[in-house]
Amino acid sequence: RIAATGSCRGQVLKYVAVGLDHRATNASSMVVMHLINLLMKTHRQVFAFTRPATARVFEKMGFTEVAKAEPLYTLLEFGFRSIRDYLDDLKSRKAPAAVKPAGAVVVNCNPFTLGHQYLIETAAAQCGVVYLFVVEEDRSVFPFADRWKLVEEGTRHLPNVVLLKGGPYVVS
């Protein structure tokens, strides 16, 4: 019989499960720590999604809650960087409070099209500042570096657009 199992995709732990007969043991921490050790060789952070009722198990292993959607999901993270670091970086890019209104757009731009450009130009015309988040995850046909360069070139003429990397937290 299998005592415990777990897997990962990218930097996300998935399908961590422990058999009923082994829940009073350290089986979950053995599986999770093994996966963390593997992932930390190539990533600076590890994420886990779980039910809020089981989030405490991950917190006892050093994970920190990022967000919760009761009663379905809790997102937790572990590693050398955290959402606080990401938020600090965003704050450093914030426009002065006098610049209003502020808008935000999240794009993947796989690839950057005239439709994307129109959307961003329209937002820029209606807002004092537009924060343009480009999804950083590399699951697209075009790699992030290429998409970033296309968005940079396509918005260079818009002085009130602040280009931001989505990091591991922004999805579209």
Could you tell me what each predicted segment is?
Residues A24-N37, K60, H116-E121:
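Conserved acetyl-CoA-binding loop-helix of GNAT-fold acetyltransferases
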Residues V12, A53-T54:
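A generic "binding-loop/recognition-motif" signal
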Residues Y15, G19-M30, R56:
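Conserved glycine-rich acetyl-CoA-binding loop
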Residues N37-A53:
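Conserved GNAT acetyl-CoA-binding A-motif
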Residues T50, F58-F63, K68-S172:
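Nucleotidyltransferase catalytic core that binds NTPs
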Residues R1-A17:
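Conserved beta-strand in the GNAT
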Residues C8-V12, K41-R44, A125-V129, H157-P159:
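Short glycine/proline-enriched coil/turn segments at helix->beta-strand junctions
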Residues L13-A17, L38, V135-E136:
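Glycine-/proline-rich flexible loop or hinge segments
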